């Protein structure tokens, strides 16, 4: 294996390629270096390598040495010559030097050696590349040359004036690299320590550049000013002979800069070069002495001179003529500022006397930069702007024009927008830069203030001071500071130039604004060094223009050039764009500050006033700019972004809590508490539980609860808000556990229910007041309230431990009696509660607690369930908050689903999308929550109403709970029967509307009136209490199916019909449908009333009658209202009608299991749970009758249902069919009512087997119950939301018949449903 070490691989290749040696050597190589050798010879060991290898190696070594030497020579020459001729012939010289170095180097010519001497041309190319590599890292050579030449020439002149020639070389400008390497103190021209470039630029190059710049500036200024002062030979472009054009061609850097991308965007050719604070390259030192040149960090250059270092040349502080235009080009203000002492710093500069230079140095240590020095030089030669010499005018005009031309050329060169990172980088520097700017501005005011009267002298002295201070201070003002100063300077300097041009400082305030506008606009372009990248407005463009108007009168500052609009707009946007953008941002900030300050200091437009303005602007920039930049806008008061669609986060309790977070605001709790108190006061009157006993406890408890709520709620809310969903779930679990714990029960008992009600209602009032405003917090508030109430109840429960035991026993008994109902009800409540969270946060707060409660209720023992009921009741009063009434059905569905789908709540369309339905759902859920809260409060007040007797309370509590459940059942069973079928109808037809209406009415009326009843059942706000009780159990069992089905159904409804759920449920509310619904409502109401009143309680029948009477005419909305008003009763009746619900649930479960049709099963389940199992089946039909069948939502529901059966949707062809369908529905409702009555008569939660309902509907194809039962076993025809879905258990086919045709099949289907119901009841029995 041959190891050939040589930089020139070709020499190695040539070894083998030589004709004569090729074969022999190849053979030798093959022989000597076969892989078979036991060892590979080390070619570098002399003894082990053959002679040809030795020769080759020697050749390679020698060639390498030669190459190294040549490279060294080339690099040294390149440095020297490139820096000498850096502006123009640096690269060409480098190339020549490389060639010369190559040629001067002895060329190896070894006989038979494969090494070939370096090709001088190639070497030249390599040296060029190397040169490029060396120069790329620093400020672009153009910029360096410009800075060096401008500054060097200026400084040379200045040293002649004896002001900044501390360096041995008068024109020495020390450009430091970020590396911090400083050129030797004595350097001619800019010394950039980038890599190897540490050579002095020839003064001739600087002179050339300066002459070019002066001519450009003068010509530009003349054009701007309309002065003919040096109109002769104006460079057509900024291209400086050796620097821009030649360098551009030869320098890879190009005229802009090959620095950091930011630097590239922020820098321009000398006059326009703006070195942003973010530039990595160098810090421009005013001083010739390197001592004052502090290593320029990215912001150092800018700090060195705000505007001039920004411009990268002495733009800010440039002499009146050169500096103004240069400043203008570099930083919008510089041009003007140079003409009229750039801002406070540059102001002195225009009078480029030794004194003024000194003053400027003092005043403009930051503003001054190398380019500013160049400007000084030019202005020095030209005279001070303040002196208003004709030459000054010409110079100022030339400067302005030159700056404009430069800015144009630079802008042309810099067409790109600065990268966003610079903005961040710059933004990071904002504070420091602003501080430095403050310091610099403060310094400037000191220096500039004196200049007010002695501006010319001060300008000279300022220039000197500027250089000196640039040397000494070199105050590293970040480009922001520089720009703020720069902008200030621009503002003032345009005035100053006007003053200079006008010769009137006073008038320059007025004319200067206009002129400043011209200059500002122009120099805004000139500012394009950075602005050129951000559409020339850059920072300088935007801020200078604004700044200069600011100094005349901020009025113009705001109206930036439309061209600059992007830059002005970019002040914020540009920030990210680059330092240019940053400058624009800063300039905007400074502009604003300047506007604020300059407005007051407009009279200061004169150079001295400008100084004052600058001083003012500096504090303003610091204060306002820093405030503007660093004052992070307060986080939005909104607790959280609008919650994602309910399906996303409603499903997740944690997410719900997180999104809806318990309102950390105590005020919300207080408002809710006050509201709860108000509602409780109403409820107290309405509640069956004696509240006389609870008065004292209520007061005490209200105080305690309020205190706890106030003290704990904020924390709890904050915790809920801050804590992740898991923590909230944990809190909920703790809450539930606490509620479950006998202590909690005892506490709840102990807590006067009235008191709790009042407290909770007060909280609800407060919360409701707050919640509507902040929905998400309200949920958290509910949770926190629940947790607080639970804690309070716990505390009180601890006091009544013995009572807890008794009460636990009683509660256990009561729960055993009501456990199914409570559980079912709780589940709906939970679902109802949790769904709202998924909607807008307003209604969310209540749901999460209920979810917890419902989850707990599902898993908690009866006593715990009862407590949970109470908690849920408390939560429902919270729901009672005045959120927009959520649609009942969605609440119901969501409740159902929420228990089952707590993890993944049904995807109800977000309330925003379906405001009516979702709001209704939310409101309904909130209503349910309110009801549950009120009921809980009632229960608590009932339990605690007799604080004297905790055991009595326990006894009373169970009794009351039982009574409440019975009363609620009695009151609501009628409403339940009716409301169940209404719920089905409402769910089907107007689930959303019904939910909305019901929830709206229910929270206000029924929550108060039937709070106690609802507390027992904790009915879902939607009219699905009974329905959902059974459905809840069923859904718990079929939770996944129901969840999926319901979510699918909801999704289908929402998707298929973007209309509110009510619309989706009731796509078409036809008269026939309404009639069917009414008939069903009447039949079901009567039947259910009969059934409910017979088995359970007569009050239920009465309520059912009232409900059915209400339901009969009920339109979807009215039904919602009725359901709303009766939903507590419904839930109570659901609790009391648990047996029927159980039967219904069993039927539904069996039907769902048999049908496994996702949406149809869910619909049936919902309907049946609402309407005693059979009623719900028809109710989907009648309410939705044709509509659901016809509605795309229903169709989508069927299509998307999980059932594998085919769904054949048949639309009723004729009103006759629809009428027959209505009749069949009525008959079916009657049958279902009979079944429900039978179940209720059994009065056991466990549904007693009811003989299969006899199908007596006038529906053709009706089968006897047995047949239907059998058919149900084989086929379960499920009417879902206005559609009859024949679910083939075998998965063969499901026929969905719209109202018309469905009427015919309704008999069979309803009979089948009834038979299925009977079968389920028998199964349950």
From Swiss-Prot:
Residues 68-92, 111-131, 291-348, 368-570, 595-614, 829-891, 935-981, 1084-1138, 1243-1272, 1293-1313 are annotated as: Disordered. Residues 428-447, 515-524 have a biased composition (Basic and acidic residues). Residues 53-85 form a coiled coil. GO terms for biological process: cell differentiation. Residues 834-850 have a biased composition (Pro residues). Residues 335-344, 400-412, 450-460, 935-948, 1088-1100, 1302-1311 have a biased composition (Polar residues). It comes from the Eukaryota. Keywords: Coiled coil. Residues 296-334, 369-378, 528-541, 1124-1138 have a biased composition (Low complexity). Able to directly activate the TNF-NFkappaB signaling pathway. This is NHS-like protein 3. It comes from Danio rerio. The gene is nhsl3.
């Amino acid at each position: 294996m041959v190891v050939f070490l040589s930089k020139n691989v070709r020499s190695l290749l040539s070894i083998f390629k030589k004709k004569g040696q090729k074969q022999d050597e190849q053979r030798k190589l093959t022989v000597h270096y076969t892989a078979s050798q036991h060892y590979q010879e080390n070619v570098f060991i002399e003894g082990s390598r053959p002679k040809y290898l030795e020769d080759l190696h020697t050749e390679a070594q020698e060639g390498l040495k030669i190459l190294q030497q040549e490279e060294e020579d080339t690099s040294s020459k390149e440095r020297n010559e490139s820096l000498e001729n850096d502006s123009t012939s640096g690269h060409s010289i480098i190339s020549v030097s490389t060639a010369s170095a190559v040629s001067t180097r002895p060329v190896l010519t070894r006989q038979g050696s494969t090494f070939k001497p370096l090709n001088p041309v190639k070497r030249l190319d390599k040296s060029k590349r190397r040169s490029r590599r060396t120069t790329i890292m620093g400020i672009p050579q153009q910029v360096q040359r410009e800075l060096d030449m401008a500054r060097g020439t200026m400084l040379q002149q200045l040293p002649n004036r004896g002001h900044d020639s501390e360096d041995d070389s008068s024109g020495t400008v020390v450009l430091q690299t970020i590396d911090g390497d400083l050129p030797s103190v004595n350097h001619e021209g800019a010394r950039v320590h980038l890599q190897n470039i540490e050579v002095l630029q020839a003064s001739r190059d600087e002179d050339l550049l300066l002459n070019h710049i002066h001519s450009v500036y003068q010509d530009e200024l003349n054009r701007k000013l309309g002065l003919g002062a040096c109109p002769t030979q104006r460079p057509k472009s900024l291209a400086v002979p050796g620097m821009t054009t030649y360098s551009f061609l030869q320098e890879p850097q190009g005229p802009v800069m090959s620095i950091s991308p930011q630097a590239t965007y922020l820098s321009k050719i000398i006059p326009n070069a703006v070195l942003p604070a973010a530039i990595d390259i160098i810090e421009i030192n005013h001083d010739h002495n390197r001592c004052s040149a502090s290593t320029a960090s990215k912001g150092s250059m800018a700090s060195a001179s705000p505007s001039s270092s920004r411009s990268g040349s002495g733009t800010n502080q440039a002499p009146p003529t050169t500096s103004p235009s240069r400043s203008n080009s570099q930083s919008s203000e510089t041009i003007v500022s140079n003409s009229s002492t750039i801002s406070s710093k540059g102001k002195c500069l225009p009078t480029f006397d030794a004194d003024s230079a000194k003053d400027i140095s003092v005043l403009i240590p930051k503003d001054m930069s190398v380019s500013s020095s160049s400007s000084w030089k030019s202005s020095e030669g030209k005279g001070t702007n303040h002196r208003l010499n004709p030459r000054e005018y010409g110079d100022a005009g030339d400067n302005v024009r030159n700056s404009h031309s430069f800015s144009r050329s630079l802008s042309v060169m810099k067409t790109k927008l600065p990268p966003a990172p610079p903005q961040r980088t710059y933004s990071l520097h904002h504070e420091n830069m602003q501080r430095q700017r403050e310091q610099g501005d403060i310094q400037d005011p000191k220096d500039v203030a004196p200049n007010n009267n002695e501006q010319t002298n001060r300008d000279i002295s300022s220039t000197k001071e500027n250089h000196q201070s640039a040397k000494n201070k070199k105050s590293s003002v970040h480009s922001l500071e520089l720009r703020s100063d720069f902008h200030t300077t621009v503002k003032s300097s345009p005035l100053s130039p006007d003053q200079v041009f006008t010769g009137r400082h006073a008038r320059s305030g007025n004319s200067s604004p206009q002129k400043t506008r011209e200059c500002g606009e122009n120099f805004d372009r000139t500012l394009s060094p950075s602005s050129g990248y951000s559409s020339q407005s850059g920072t300088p463009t935007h801020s200078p223009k604004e700044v200069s108007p600011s100094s005349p009168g901020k009025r113009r500052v705001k109206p930036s050039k439309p061209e600059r609009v992007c830059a002005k707009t970019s002040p914020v946007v540009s920030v990210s764009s680059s330092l240019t953008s940053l400058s624009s941002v800063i300039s905007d900030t400074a502009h604003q500050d300047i506007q604020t300050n300059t407005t007051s200091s407009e009279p200061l437009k004169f150079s001295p006033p400008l100084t004052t303005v600058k001083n003012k602007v500096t504090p303003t920039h610091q204060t306002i700019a820093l405030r503007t930049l660093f004052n992070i806008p307060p986080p939005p008061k909104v607790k959280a972004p609008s919650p994602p669609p309910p399906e996303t986060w409603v499903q997740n309790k944690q997410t719900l809590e997180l999104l809806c977070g318990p309102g950390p605001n105590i005020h919300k709790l207080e408002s809710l508490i006050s509201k709860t108190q108000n509602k409780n006061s109403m409820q107290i009157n309405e509640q069956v539980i004696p509240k006389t006993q609870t008065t004292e406890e209520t007061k005490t408890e209200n105080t305690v609860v309020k205190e706890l709520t106030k003290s704990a709620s904020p924390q709890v809310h904050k915790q809920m808000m801050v804590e992740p969903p898991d923590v909230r779930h944990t809190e909920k679990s703790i809450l539930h556990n606490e509620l479950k714990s006998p202590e909690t029960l005892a506490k709840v008992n102990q807590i006067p229910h009235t008191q709790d009600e009042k407290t909770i209602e007060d909280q609800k009032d407060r919360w409701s007041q707050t919640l509507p405003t902040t929905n998400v917090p309200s949920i958290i508030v509910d949770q926190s309230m629940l947790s607080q109430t639970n804690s309070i109840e716990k505390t009180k429960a601890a006091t009544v431990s013995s009572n807890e035991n008794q009460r636990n026993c009683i509660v256990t008994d009561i729960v055993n009696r009501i456990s199914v109902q409570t559980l079912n009800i709780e589940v709906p409540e939970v679902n109802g509660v949790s769904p709202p969270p998924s909607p807008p946060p307003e209604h969310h707060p209540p749901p999460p607690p209920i979810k917890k409660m419902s989850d707990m209720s599902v898993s908690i023992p009866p006593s715990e369930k009862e407590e949970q009921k109470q908690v849920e009741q408390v939560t429902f009063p919270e729901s009672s908050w005045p959120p927009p009434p959520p649609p009942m059905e969605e609440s119901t569905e969501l409740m159902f689903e929420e228990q089952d789908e707590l993890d993944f709540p049904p995807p109800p369309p977000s309330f925003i999308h379906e405001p009516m339905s979702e709001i209704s759902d939310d409101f309904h859920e909130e209503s349910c929550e309110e009801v549950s809260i009120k009921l809980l409060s009632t229960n608590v007040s009932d339990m605690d109403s007799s604080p004297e007797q905790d055991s009595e309370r326990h006894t009373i509590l169970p009794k009351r709970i039982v009574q409440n459940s019975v009363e609620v059942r009695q009151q609501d069973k009628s409403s339940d029967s009716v409301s169940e079928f209404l719920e089905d109808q409402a769910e089907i037809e107007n689930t959303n509307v019904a939910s909305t209406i019901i929830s709206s009415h229910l929270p206000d009326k029924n929550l108060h009136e039937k709070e106690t009843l609802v507390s027992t059942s904790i009915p879902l706000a939607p009219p699905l209490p009974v329905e959902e009780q059974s459905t809840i159990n069923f859904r718990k069992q079929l939770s996944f199916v129901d969840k999926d089905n319901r979510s699918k159904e909801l999704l289908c409804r929402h998707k298929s019909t973007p209309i509110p759920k009510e619309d989706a449920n009731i796509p078409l509310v036809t008269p026939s449908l309404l009639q069917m619904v009414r008939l069903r409502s009447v039949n079901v109401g009567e039947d259910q009333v009969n059934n409910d009143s017979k088995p359970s309680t007569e009050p239920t029948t009465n309520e059912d009658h009232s409900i059915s009477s209400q339901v009969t005419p009920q339109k979807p909305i009215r039904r919602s209202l009725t359901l709303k008003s009766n939903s507590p009763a419904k839930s109570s009746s659901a609790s009391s009608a648990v047996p029927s619900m159980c039967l219904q649930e069993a039927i539904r479960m069996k039907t769902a299991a048999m049908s496994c049709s996702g949406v149809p099963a869910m619909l049936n389940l919902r309907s049946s749970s609402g309407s005693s199992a059979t009623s719900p089946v028809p109710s989907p039909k009648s309410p939705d009758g044709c509509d659901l069948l016809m509605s795309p939502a229903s169709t989508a529901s069927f299509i998307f249902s999980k059932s594998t059966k085919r769904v054949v949707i048949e639309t009723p062809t004729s009103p006759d069919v629809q009428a027959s369908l209505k009749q069949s529905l009525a008959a079916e409702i009657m049958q279902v009512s009979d079944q429900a009555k039978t179940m209720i008569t059994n009065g056991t939660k466990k549904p007693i087997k009811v003989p299969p309902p006899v199908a007596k509907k006038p529906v053709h194809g009706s089968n006897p119950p047995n047949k239907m039962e059998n058919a149900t076993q084989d086929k379960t025809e499920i009417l879902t939301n206005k559609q009859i879905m024949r679910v083939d258990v075998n998965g063969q086919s499901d026929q969905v018949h719209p109202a018309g045709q469905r009427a015919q099949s309704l008999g069979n289907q309803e009979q089948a449903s009834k038979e299925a119901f009977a079968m389920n009841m028998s199964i349950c029995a």
